[in-house]
Amino acid sequence: MIIYNTLTGIKEPFVPFSIDNVRVYVCGPTVYDFAHIGNARSVVIYDVLFRLLKLLYPKVTYVRNITDIDDKIINVAQNTNQSIYDVTAIYIKAFHEDMRMLNCLEPTYEPRATDNIDVIISLIQKLVDSGHAYVYNGSVFFNIESYSSYGQLSGRNISQLIYGSRIDIEVGKKHPGDFVLWKPATEIDNQLMSCWSSPWGLGRPGWHIECSAMSYRYLKENFDIHGGGADLQFPHHENEIAQSCCAFPDSRYAKYWVHNGFLTVNDEKMSKSLGNVLTVRQLLNSGITGELIRYVLLSTHYRKPLDWNSQMVASAQESLNRMYTALSSTNVDLSLDDSVELSSHVIDCLKDDINTPKAISMLHEMVTEINKTADMIEKISLTKTLIKTANFLGILQHSWQDWFKIDDNNQEISQLIDERKKARANNDFKRADDIRQLLLNRGIVLSDNKDGTTHWYKK
């Protein structure tokens, strides 16, 4: 397996610290609202990576955190007269429901920041004691000038970090690039109980230290892969490296850094001001299936930008319909036995830097072979491999009947299809076309197979 490492800027052979337990950490959601489609892209991409690693190695420990203490969470709690725990409980539950609809596996561990305050405080104290952090009026800041390799992930150097350059400016900082590890409690924090006792007084952790603490608790000083969106590369991931490597000088923290690309909607960045934030829940409620969402997210290479638009969704729908139509030609049972093997060609695509679009194109080549062959034994064998391999990618989870919402008791549609078949046999193509259009006007799409049969599905 080879993977692109943001830290080195090249694709590298994947060599884990231990083949007996591959360890992965991915930045998860901040739970103040429903997950949007950009959040979902990250979850789906690292779900495929998790599946692949589980195939290749005997044990994989996958940690995806939940940020359940944050300024945005506090704002929602304050505006809705709820506790932060009530707010986060709502959106954690929703996140889990939505990701299940996208057929994502659960991570091995899903720690919450508020359950790890003791680890966070211990790590901050370690940085203070070693001179890499300093205290000012109840705040604790990390001193970036104490870490000579700061900027290695993002390609920045300390001299570039001037006031106003994507960094928070706060009173008490020694350098404008220094970042907060611990914030003193405000009056609102006290009211909402969003603060904890510490050696520096009541307060709450900064965002960056949370991930360092949780990755350390579950994966220790060194682990194999750290994933997240490209927007997290700086400052979040850069700061994680700095504080973790300073807390544990003999460690390198994560060996491989993997970042998925940005997602836009109709060529525009998602933002509440534009009113174009698409949540997974909105899409599901609009009738777009979780499998279709997943297919769209996998149809572009994870490192490339992805633009969500109606044309892409329609194209993905047609592609999935084509796959399910191929299943209908053999009617193979979805519950396959272990003797059915995955397509080695598809797995090879995934082993080449998680190349999901190429893997999907290989699935469509299999569909073409299924449609071409007249040998039913070969057709069934190919169909079984298609189902097993597509399932590995998290798609083709339904029977073709369920996918096309077929109702076997709808005699009228069956009679019209039979009438159309007779019309075609008698070269009455106008009548055949009229019947097709009549059904189309009612939302029924016909799909003619090479063996002379016709299936239908609802738009």
From Swiss-Prot:
Reaction catalyzed: tRNA(Cys) + L-cysteine + ATP = L-cysteinyl-tRNA(Cys) + AMP + diphosphate
First-level EC class: ligase
Chain positions recorded as Zn(2+) binding sites: C27, C211, H236, E240
Chain span(s) of sequence motif 'HIGH' region: 29-39
Details of cofactor binding: Binds 1 zinc ion per subunit.
Matches recorded under InterPro entries: Cys-tRNA-ligase, Cys-tRNA-synt_Ia_DALR, Cys-tRNA/MSH_ligase, CysS_C, Rossmann-like_a/b/a_fold, tRNA-synt_1_cat_dom, tRNAsynth_Ia_anticodon-bd
EC number: 6.1.1.16
Positions that bind ATP: K272
Cofactor(s) required for function per UniProt: Zn(2+)
UniProt motif 'KMSKS' region: location: 269-273
UniProt entry tagged with the keyword Methyltransferase: no
Keywords on record: Aminoacyl-tRNA synthetase, ATP-binding, Cytoplasm, Ligase, Metal-binding, Nucleotide-binding, Protein biosynthesis, Zinc
PANTHER family found in the cross-reference section: CYSTEINE--TRNA LIGASE, CYTOPLASMIC, CYSTEINYL-TRNA SYNTHETASE
Subunit structure: Monomer.
Listed name of the protein: Cysteine--tRNA ligase
Source organism: Ehrlichia chaffeensis (strain ATCC CRL-10679 / Arkansas)
Gene: cysS
